Each structure stands twice: as C-alpha cells, then as structure tokens.
Amino acid sequence: MPVSGADPKPGLPLPSGPSTPASVQTLAFARDPVGALLSARAAYGPLFTLRFAGVGPVVAIADVDAAVRLMDADPQAARAGEARRRILPQASSRSSFGADADRHRAARGRIESAFAPARIERLDGGLRRLAESHVDHWPMGRPFRMLPRMRTLTQDVFVRLMLGVRDEARAAALVAAMRRLLWTPGNPPLTPPDRDEPGGPLVDAVFRRRLRPVAQLLDEEVRARRGNGTPGDTILDLMVASQPRLSGEEAVDELLVVMAAAQEPPSIALAWLVERLARHPEVAEAFVKAGPGDPVRHAIIDETLRLRPPAMASLRRLTAPFDANGVELPAGTMTMAPIPLLHRDPESFPDAEEFRPARFDGNLNRPEAFRPFGGGARRCIAEPLARAEMHAAIGVVFNRLRVRALWPRPERPVQRATVLVPHRSVPVLTGARLPASPEPAR
C-alpha cells in the first residue's frame, strides 16, 4: 500500500463544493457550521469539498456507509493524528491525540486503563460529591452562563479524580490555570503563527503564555509522583510507571493534550444537556425520576449527543486512495466525517431536527450512524468518563434546581476549533427545586 504525506497532486479532481473563497467559507462555517454543512449537502450531495483558510480543501463524507468505513479504516492509511495536527498545531505528535500508528497505540495504551468503564464506575461517588460542591456555589435567582461552570467542574473532576492530584493547593492552582488556558481567545488557535493569518502570532503568544503555568504544575506533580513510588491507577500513575520511562517533558507533553481533549468536549456536552432539559421541562422531569443507570436517562443523553454533538467531525488525512462509494479520493486528501450530518441522516433519524429521546428506545434504523465519540481505533478514549459525568452531574443539577433558559430561541452551535459550542454559552436562571432530593448512587 503506497503511503504518502503529500497533498493531492495538482489536477486530481476532488468532489465539487462551494465556490466561494476559502476565507468566506471559513467565516460562514465558524458562525453556523451545521447550517453550512446542511446547505452543502443539499447542493452537492453526501460528498463535497469545503475550503478553509490556512488548511486548504477538506472533503466531507456524509454518506453513512462511507463515513463509517473512513472512521474504521486502517489507521496507517487514514491518519487522524496528522489531520488533527494540521488543524491544531498544539496537538503534539507524542500524545494520543496527535500521534499516529505505533506512537498512537503506545500513547493510548499508557492511559487506557484509567478510562476503563469499571474504574470510571468506581468514581461515581466522587463525581457526585464534586458536582454537589460546585452546584452549591452557583448563583440563585440571577442569570449566569452554564458553559463556564461546566468547564470548571470537568477540570476539577479531571485534576482530582483522573490525575489523582492530592495536594489541595496544587489541585486548585492547576484547575485555575487550566481555566485560564481554555479561555484563551481562539484556543486552540485557528490562525497559528506558521500561517500568514491575521492575528495568528498574537493569539498563539497568549496561548503559550497561559500554557506555561499549567506545564509547570504538571511537571511538579510528575516529580512528586515519581518520588512517592506508590503504584496507582490514575493517568499520572500510569504515565510515571510506563516503560520505557517517559522523561518529565514527554509526560507533560502528553498530559497537556489529554487534559484538554478529555475536558472540553464533556463540558460542552454537559452544557448542551442542560440547555436541552431547560427547554424541555417534561424531559427534565423524566430524567430526574428515572434515576442513575435507567434506560430513560441513557436515551435523553444520547438524543442530546445526536442533536448537539460536541465534536464537529472525525478527521483523517489519507495516505492511500480511498473509495467513497465509487468516488476515489487520492492519497494526501484531508477528509472529515461530519458528525452533525451523520446524526441528521434522514434514513437513520427521521424528523432529525426534533428533540425526541424516545428514538433511542432500541429501534434505531441505522445505529452505526450515531457517532458522537467517533469510531475505529480513534474512538474517544474518554467516552466512559464523559457519560459518567453526564449521568452524575446533570442528575445533581436537576434534582436540586429548577433551570430556566433565558432566551426563547434555542442556542445554535458555533465552531471553536474542532468542537461545537453553544453560541451564548447557555445563559440560565436557576431556583431551588422543592422538595430537593439527593441524587441516589448508581
């Protein structure tokens, strides 16, 4: 199988797509990614080419069969790490997020057991206690935005439960430093300095400055954990114990990307779930009554992930030709399986724009179209954690509070790097739920 990292050769045709300049397409996609994808599919069918400033042509594969084959393809022939690094230069080639082939398998293998469903299930009590401590400090009777609150919660969960940071001062400092880092404008920068894009160097400079204290705190924790020598099952413990031994710099490099990738999408998913339940009080009531582990809760969570997936797409850069249902895409092509389009496939999800959790009662026409966590060898490693956070945190929120959306119109997704965030960050008004009831354990 020929392997090449080069772009498609000049003259090799790509599928048709919008003819507007790349800068115009980039702006339109950032403002309304779902609308841009739906318009392109309506005009050009399930296979079309978009052009993004600083990235170039990207072929969108919205046919379910072809998209599933792309996600499940040989990782050497369809490289996710290379595609991510092209979009996100901060994605280190040494991390499980930005690596490919053997390096990806090694990086993922080092931390996989920390995300094992059995281990995550044991964290349920800690998840609920952290959620309760955060919800207790939310404003009552005055508006606030839900997304920043959920970011702080997921950062706290990751630092304390997934990394296992026991030093209270260091844990608090790391959560605060991660919060500042993830609030960097454009983070991860859409216009990095190695591309001649306005504002790229400035945005990246802010990102690098806020990155330093996070890296320093992680390095301190790695050193402390190595000095302790006590085995454990947290991500840090597994990295410290890995063979061959990682240098401190290598461990921090991997941790930085894993921290961002394992926190940002779950916090967005939590905010979207609050937004959906605040606009559908009857569904919120069903969520509360169902209790942890009930199929009703699973269905509500899955329908939210279908209609409002945090991830924009599964990205792959081809190193060998790929047959997209009769259309051969050449090696070097940047491709994406756009998750919002897969989740709006009319055959798989009739009346796709309706928020209807009952569709997940086990009778999906094509369950393979539901891909909120991607697929294949690059399926999101943090899926068990994200689902546990949605069950535990949202259970606490709606057992304790009545939540009302401030705006009459639903939030729309906007692009932020490779994720889709609510454009107003979910402004809500909360009041006490009477009588309040504790969230039972799983």
Regions found by a protein language model. Give the residues of each.
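Cytochrome P450 catalytic core segment centered on helix I
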Residues: 3, 14, 177-245
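Cytochrome P450
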Residues: 3-13, 36, 51-59, 80-83, 92-112, 118-129, 138-160, 169-176, ...
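Conserved cytochrome P450 K-helix E-x-x-R motif and the immediately C-terminal K′/meander segment
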Residues: 25-45, 292-327, 346
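Cytochrome P450 heme-binding "Cys pocket" and the immediately downstream C-terminal segment
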Residues: 383-419
